[in-house]
Amino acid sequence: MTDAAVSFAKDFLAGGVAAAISKTAVAPIERVKLLLQVQHASKQITADKQYKGIMDCVVRIPKEQGVLSFWRGNLANVIRYFPTQALNFAFKDKYKQIFLGGVDKRTQFWRYFAGNLASGGAAGATSLCFVYPLDFARTRLAADVGKAGDAREFKGLGDCLVKITKSDGIRGLYQGFNVSVQGIIIYRAAYFGIYDTAKGMLPDPKNTHIFISWMIAQSVTAVAGLTSYPFDTVRRRMMMQSGRKGSDIMYTGTIDCWKKIARDEGSKAFFKGAWSNVLRGMGGAFVLVLYDEIKKYT
Protein backbone atom coordinates (compact mmCIF):
# COMPACT_ATOMS: atom_id res chain seq x y z
CA MET A 1 0.00 0.00 0.00
CA THR A 2 1.13 3.54 -0.68
CA ASP A 3 1.69 6.01 2.14
CA ALA A 4 -1.46 7.88 1.06
CA ALA A 5 -3.54 4.69 1.23
CA VAL A 6 -2.17 3.81 4.67
CA SER A 7 -2.94 7.32 5.92
CA PHE A 8 -6.49 7.10 4.53
CA ALA A 9 -7.03 3.71 6.21
CA LYS A 10 -5.74 5.02 9.54
CA ASP A 11 -8.10 8.00 9.35
CA PHE A 12 -11.01 5.71 8.52
CA LEU A 13 -10.29 3.31 11.40
CA ALA A 14 -9.42 5.89 14.06
CA GLY A 15 -12.44 8.05 13.29
CA GLY A 16 -14.86 5.13 13.10
CA VAL A 17 -13.79 3.41 16.34
CA ALA A 18 -13.82 6.65 18.34
CA ALA A 19 -17.27 7.52 17.00
CA ALA A 20 -18.83 4.10 17.70
CA ILE A 21 -17.70 4.18 21.34
CA SER A 22 -18.91 7.70 22.07
CA LYS A 23 -22.26 7.27 20.27
CA THR A 24 -23.18 4.21 22.30
CA ALA A 25 -22.35 6.08 25.51
CA VAL A 26 -24.66 9.02 24.73
CA ALA A 27 -27.45 7.00 23.05
CA PRO A 28 -30.02 7.68 25.84
CA ILE A 29 -29.51 11.45 25.47
CA GLU A 30 -29.79 11.08 21.71
CA ARG A 31 -33.15 9.31 21.97
CA VAL A 32 -34.57 11.93 24.35
CA LYS A 33 -33.52 14.66 21.93
CA LEU A 34 -35.13 12.90 18.96
CA LEU A 35 -38.42 12.26 20.75
CA LEU A 36 -38.71 15.92 21.77
CA GLN A 37 -38.00 16.97 18.19
CA VAL A 38 -40.47 14.73 16.37
CA GLN A 39 -43.29 14.03 18.85
CA HIS A 40 -45.57 16.60 17.18
CA ALA A 41 -45.20 14.71 13.90
CA SER A 42 -45.65 11.23 15.40
CA LYS A 43 -48.86 9.22 14.88
CA GLN A 44 -48.09 7.21 18.03
CA ILE A 45 -47.81 10.19 20.40
CA THR A 46 -51.16 11.93 20.87
CA ALA A 47 -51.34 15.52 22.18
CA ASP A 48 -52.17 14.41 25.74
CA LYS A 49 -49.19 12.03 25.83
CA GLN A 50 -46.52 14.39 24.51
CA TYR A 51 -43.39 14.86 26.62
CA LYS A 52 -43.21 18.15 28.51
CA GLY A 53 -39.43 18.37 28.49
CA ILE A 54 -36.16 16.52 28.99
CA MET A 55 -36.81 15.32 32.56
CA ASP A 56 -40.38 14.21 31.79
CA CYS A 57 -39.00 12.22 28.86
CA VAL A 58 -36.20 10.66 30.92
CA VAL A 59 -38.65 9.58 33.66
CA ARG A 60 -41.39 8.23 31.39
CA ILE A 61 -39.32 6.26 28.87
CA PRO A 62 -38.19 3.50 31.29
CA LYS A 63 -41.67 3.34 32.88
CA GLU A 64 -43.56 3.07 29.61
CA GLN A 65 -41.09 1.28 27.35
CA GLY A 66 -38.42 -0.23 29.62
CA VAL A 67 -34.87 0.88 30.42
CA LEU A 68 -33.34 -0.77 27.35
CA SER A 69 -35.56 1.36 25.12
CA PHE A 70 -33.15 4.25 25.77
CA TRP A 71 -30.94 2.48 23.22
CA ARG A 72 -33.72 2.00 20.67
CA GLY A 73 -32.26 2.79 17.27
CA ASN A 74 -28.70 2.67 18.62
CA LEU A 75 -27.63 -0.25 16.42
CA ALA A 76 -28.63 1.70 13.32
CA ASN A 77 -26.85 4.71 14.76
CA VAL A 78 -23.60 2.83 15.36
CA ILE A 79 -23.73 1.21 11.92
CA ARG A 80 -24.48 4.62 10.40
CA TYR A 81 -22.05 6.56 12.52
CA PHE A 82 -19.03 4.37 11.85
CA PRO A 83 -18.88 5.04 8.09
CA THR A 84 -20.23 8.59 8.49
CA GLN A 85 -17.61 9.80 10.92
CA ALA A 86 -14.83 7.73 9.39
CA LEU A 87 -15.63 9.06 5.90
CA ASN A 88 -15.94 12.60 7.27
CA PHE A 89 -12.48 12.50 8.80
CA ALA A 90 -10.96 10.71 5.81
CA PHE A 91 -12.50 13.00 3.18
CA LYS A 92 -11.83 16.06 5.32
CA ASP A 93 -8.10 15.59 4.92
CA LYS A 94 -8.53 15.02 1.17
CA TYR A 95 -10.60 18.18 0.84
CA LYS A 96 -8.05 20.07 2.94
CA GLN A 97 -5.43 19.25 0.31
CA ILE A 98 -7.75 20.80 -2.29
CA PHE A 99 -8.83 23.90 -0.36
CA LEU A 100 -5.69 24.53 1.71
CA GLY A 101 -2.86 23.59 -0.63
CA GLY A 102 -0.15 26.25 -0.45
CA VAL A 103 -2.02 28.37 2.13
CA ASP A 104 0.08 29.80 4.99
CA LYS A 105 -2.07 29.78 8.13
CA ARG A 106 0.03 32.52 9.75
CA THR A 107 0.01 35.07 6.94
CA GLN A 108 -3.28 34.08 5.24
CA PHE A 109 -5.54 33.53 8.26
CA TRP A 110 -8.91 34.22 6.61
CA ARG A 111 -8.10 32.11 3.59
CA TYR A 112 -6.97 29.35 5.95
CA PHE A 113 -10.19 29.68 7.97
CA ALA A 114 -12.38 29.65 4.83
CA GLY A 115 -10.51 26.61 3.53
CA ASN A 116 -11.17 24.72 6.75
CA LEU A 117 -14.87 25.65 6.58
CA ALA A 118 -15.09 24.46 2.98
CA SER A 119 -13.25 21.17 3.63
CA GLY A 120 -15.37 20.38 6.69
CA GLY A 121 -18.64 21.17 4.94
CA ALA A 122 -17.76 19.26 1.78
CA ALA A 123 -16.70 16.19 3.80
CA GLY A 124 -19.99 16.14 5.70
CA ALA A 125 -22.15 16.56 2.59
CA THR A 126 -20.26 13.85 0.68
CA SER A 127 -20.60 11.33 3.51
CA LEU A 128 -24.32 12.06 3.93
CA CYS A 129 -25.04 10.93 0.37
CA PHE A 130 -23.85 7.41 1.24
CA VAL A 131 -25.39 6.86 4.68
CA TYR A 132 -28.65 8.84 4.69
CA PRO A 133 -30.97 5.77 4.66
CA LEU A 134 -29.31 4.57 7.89
CA ASP A 135 -29.76 7.99 9.47
CA PHE A 136 -33.41 7.90 8.39
CA ALA A 137 -33.91 4.44 9.93
CA ARG A 138 -32.20 5.48 13.17
CA THR A 139 -34.63 8.40 13.52
CA ARG A 140 -37.74 6.32 12.85
CA LEU A 141 -36.64 3.56 15.23
CA ALA A 142 -35.84 6.05 18.01
CA ALA A 143 -39.22 7.76 17.47
CA ASP A 144 -41.07 4.44 17.82
CA VAL A 145 -42.65 4.54 21.31
CA GLY A 146 -44.50 1.22 21.12
CA LYS A 147 -43.83 -1.09 24.08
CA ALA A 148 -43.41 -4.38 22.22
CA GLY A 149 -44.77 -6.61 19.49
CA ASP A 150 -47.67 -5.19 17.51
CA ALA A 151 -47.44 -1.87 19.36
CA ARG A 152 -44.10 -1.21 17.67
CA GLU A 153 -44.16 0.46 14.26
CA PHE A 154 -40.98 -1.33 13.21
CA LYS A 155 -39.41 -4.55 14.50
CA GLY A 156 -35.87 -3.40 13.77
CA LEU A 157 -33.49 -1.81 11.27
CA GLY A 158 -34.18 -4.23 8.42
CA ASP A 159 -37.95 -4.11 8.94
CA CYS A 160 -37.90 -0.30 8.86
CA LEU A 161 -35.93 -0.10 5.61
CA VAL A 162 -38.09 -2.77 3.92
CA LYS A 163 -41.46 -1.28 4.98
CA ILE A 164 -40.60 2.27 3.92
CA THR A 165 -39.13 1.07 0.61
CA LYS A 166 -42.30 -0.93 -0.12
CA SER A 167 -44.63 1.98 0.67
CA ASP A 168 -42.64 4.94 -0.70
CA GLY A 169 -39.81 3.47 -2.75
CA ILE A 170 -36.14 4.38 -2.32
CA ARG A 171 -37.19 8.04 -2.34
CA GLY A 172 -38.90 7.49 1.01
CA LEU A 173 -35.55 6.69 2.63
CA TYR A 174 -34.25 10.08 1.51
CA GLN A 175 -37.14 12.18 2.88
CA GLY A 176 -35.70 15.46 4.16
CA PHE A 177 -32.40 14.97 2.34
CA ASN A 178 -32.17 18.49 0.91
CA VAL A 179 -32.53 20.26 4.25
CA SER A 180 -30.18 17.66 5.73
CA VAL A 181 -27.46 18.67 3.28
CA GLN A 182 -27.95 22.33 4.21
CA GLY A 183 -27.75 21.54 7.92
CA ILE A 184 -24.83 19.14 7.65
CA ILE A 185 -22.75 21.65 5.70
CA ILE A 186 -23.35 24.29 8.37
CA TYR A 187 -22.64 21.85 11.20
CA ARG A 188 -19.57 20.21 9.70
CA ALA A 189 -18.16 23.52 8.54
CA ALA A 190 -18.16 24.76 12.12
CA TYR A 191 -17.29 21.36 13.62
CA PHE A 192 -14.16 20.85 11.57
CA GLY A 193 -13.40 24.37 10.39
CA ILE A 194 -13.32 26.16 13.73
CA TYR A 195 -11.67 23.22 15.54
CA ASP A 196 -8.88 22.82 13.02
CA THR A 197 -8.38 26.57 12.80
CA ALA A 198 -8.18 26.95 16.60
CA LYS A 199 -5.77 24.03 16.96
CA GLY A 200 -3.71 25.26 14.04
CA MET A 201 -3.18 28.61 15.76
CA LEU A 202 -1.71 26.96 18.88
CA PRO A 203 2.11 27.10 19.28
CA ASP A 204 2.49 23.30 19.23
CA PRO A 205 -0.78 21.66 18.04
CA LYS A 206 0.54 18.08 18.13
CA ASN A 207 1.56 18.33 21.79
CA THR A 208 -1.42 20.29 23.09
CA HIS A 209 -2.68 19.11 26.50
CA ILE A 210 -5.73 16.86 26.14
CA PHE A 211 -7.78 19.16 28.44
CA ILE A 212 -7.17 22.15 26.15
CA SER A 213 -8.13 20.03 23.14
CA TRP A 214 -11.32 18.93 24.91
CA MET A 215 -12.26 22.50 25.84
CA ILE A 216 -11.82 23.65 22.24
CA ALA A 217 -13.78 20.66 20.96
CA GLN A 218 -16.56 21.19 23.52
CA SER A 219 -17.02 24.82 22.51
CA VAL A 220 -16.99 23.92 18.82
CA THR A 221 -19.60 21.15 19.11
CA ALA A 222 -21.92 23.35 21.21
CA VAL A 223 -21.79 26.27 18.76
CA ALA A 224 -22.06 24.02 15.69
CA GLY A 225 -24.97 22.08 17.17
CA LEU A 226 -27.04 25.12 18.10
CA THR A 227 -26.37 26.86 14.79
CA SER A 228 -27.61 23.95 12.71
CA TYR A 229 -30.32 22.69 15.11
CA PRO A 230 -33.36 24.20 13.32
CA PHE A 231 -32.30 22.42 10.12
CA ASP A 232 -32.02 19.17 12.08
CA THR A 233 -35.51 19.60 13.54
CA VAL A 234 -37.04 20.16 10.09
CA ARG A 235 -35.27 17.17 8.56
CA ARG A 236 -36.39 14.89 11.40
CA ARG A 237 -39.98 16.06 10.95
CA MET A 238 -39.74 15.36 7.22
CA MET A 239 -38.38 11.87 7.93
CA MET A 240 -41.57 11.17 9.90
CA GLN A 241 -43.64 11.73 6.71
CA SER A 242 -42.41 8.59 4.95
CA GLY A 243 -44.98 5.80 4.97
CA ARG A 244 -47.92 8.20 5.33
CA LYS A 245 -50.71 8.63 2.83
CA GLY A 246 -53.44 11.19 2.18
CA SER A 247 -54.65 13.15 5.20
CA ASP A 248 -51.92 11.64 7.41
CA ILE A 249 -49.29 13.75 5.62
CA MET A 250 -48.54 16.79 7.77
CA TYR A 251 -46.11 18.65 5.52
CA THR A 252 -46.22 18.96 1.74
CA GLY A 253 -42.51 19.78 1.61
CA THR A 254 -39.56 21.29 3.44
CA ILE A 255 -40.69 24.91 3.07
CA ASP A 256 -44.19 23.96 4.27
CA CYS A 257 -42.60 22.27 7.28
CA TRP A 258 -40.63 25.41 8.20
CA LYS A 259 -43.78 27.53 7.89
CA LYS A 260 -46.09 25.23 9.88
CA ILE A 261 -43.65 24.72 12.75
CA ALA A 262 -43.14 28.49 13.06
CA ARG A 263 -46.87 29.24 12.75
CA ASP A 264 -48.35 26.43 14.86
CA GLU A 265 -45.66 25.87 17.49
CA GLY A 266 -43.58 29.05 17.52
CA SER A 267 -39.88 29.62 16.85
CA LYS A 268 -38.91 27.84 20.08
CA ALA A 269 -40.12 24.58 18.54
CA PHE A 270 -37.13 24.58 16.20
CA PHE A 271 -34.92 24.17 19.29
CA LYS A 272 -36.84 21.46 21.16
CA GLY A 273 -34.29 19.08 22.66
CA ALA A 274 -31.45 21.52 21.99
CA TRP A 275 -30.16 21.36 25.57
CA SER A 276 -29.90 17.58 25.42
CA ASN A 277 -28.11 18.11 22.12
CA VAL A 278 -25.47 20.20 23.91
CA LEU A 279 -25.01 17.38 26.44
CA ARG A 280 -24.81 14.89 23.58
CA GLY A 281 -22.21 17.18 22.03
CA MET A 282 -19.84 16.17 24.81
CA GLY A 283 -19.64 12.87 22.97
CA GLY A 284 -18.82 14.71 19.76
CA ALA A 285 -16.10 16.67 21.53
CA PHE A 286 -14.74 13.40 22.91
CA VAL A 287 -14.62 11.99 19.36
CA LEU A 288 -12.47 14.87 18.11
CA VAL A 289 -10.03 14.56 21.01
CA LEU A 290 -9.96 10.75 20.93
CA TYR A 291 -9.36 10.82 17.16
CA ASP A 292 -6.30 13.04 17.65
CA GLU A 293 -5.01 10.80 20.46
CA ILE A 294 -5.49 7.58 18.43
CA LYS A 295 -3.67 9.08 15.44
CA LYS A 296 -0.63 9.76 17.64
CA TYR A 297 -0.17 6.00 18.08
CA THR A 298 -1.04 4.81 14.56
Curated annotation (Swiss-Prot):
The chain crosses the membrane at residues 8-37, 75-99, 110-130, 179-199, 211-231, 274-291. The modification N6-acetyllysine is found at residues 105, 147, 155, 163, 166, 268. Residues 1-7, 100-109, 200-210, 292-298 are mitochondrial intermembrane. Residues 38-74, 131-178, 232-273 are mitochondrial matrix. It is a multi-pass membrane protein. ADP:ATP antiporter that mediates import of ADP into the mitochondrial matrix for ATP synthesis, and export of ATP out to fuel the cell. Cycles between the cytoplasmic-open state (c-state) and the matrix-open state (m-state): operates by the alternating access mechanism with a single substrate-binding site intermittently exposed to either the cytosolic (c-state) or matrix (m-state) side of the inner mitochondrial membrane. In addition to its ADP:ATP antiporter activity, also involved in mitochondrial uncoupling and mitochondrial permeability transition pore (mPTP) activity. This is ADP/ATP translocase 2.
